[in-house]
């Protein structure tokens, strides 16, 4: 029984940006960017979010721009 579970393929993550039809990631869209930030304020990894590498770079750039413009916090406020 354990062998059958080990042979099972993991389910592929659905790309949330492709699902919603989003082609351009804007730094002013904080509602979208918050989906890709952890509760600690870190940018989530590709393997967690399911986006492509190009989209991940665009998200990272948009989050950094939004932080610079004070639209997103650099770190979480909770301790």
Curated annotation (Swiss-Prot):
The protein depicted here goes by the name Small ribosomal subunit protein bS18
- Originating organism: Salinispora arenicola (strain CNS-205)
So what family is this one in? Belongs to the bacterial ribosomal protein bS18 family.
Functional summary from the UniProt entry = Binds as a heterodimer with protein bS6 to the central domain of the 16S rRNA, where it helps stabilize the platform of the 30S subunit.
Q: Quick check: keyword Protein biosynthesis in the entry? A: no
Q: Subunit composition?
A: Part of the 30S ribosomal subunit. Forms a tight heterodimer with protein bS6.
Q: Which GO terms describe its biological process?
A: translation
**Coiled coil (UniProt feature):** none
Q: Which Pfam families match?
A: Ribosomal_S18
Which keywords has UniProt assigned to this entry? Answer: Ribonucleoprotein, Ribosomal protein, RNA-binding, rRNA-binding
SUPFAM superfamilies in the cross-refs: Ribosomal protein S18 (SSF46911)
- NCBIfam families, per database record: S18
Q: Which HAMAP family match?
A: Ribosomal_bS18 (MF_00270)
Q: Which GO terms describe its molecular function?
A: small ribosomal subunit rRNA binding; structural constituent of ribosome
Q: Which gene encodes it?
A: rpsR
Cited InterPro entries? Ribosomal_bS18 (IPR001648), Ribosomal_bS18_CS (IPR018275), Ribosomal_bS18_sf (IPR036870)
Q: Does the keyword Lyase apply?
A: no
GO terms under cellular component? cytosolic small ribosomal subunit
């Amino acid at each position: 029984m354990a062998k059958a579970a080990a042979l099972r393929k993991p389910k592929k993550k659905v790309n949330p940006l492709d699902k919603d039809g989003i082609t351009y990631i804007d730094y002013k869209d904080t509602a979208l960017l918050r989906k890709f930030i952890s509760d600690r304020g870190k940018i989530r990894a590709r393997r967690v979010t399911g986006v492509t590498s190009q989209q991940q770079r665009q998200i990272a750039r948009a989050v950094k721009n939004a932080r610079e413009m004070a639209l997103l916090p650099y770190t979480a406020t909770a301790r």
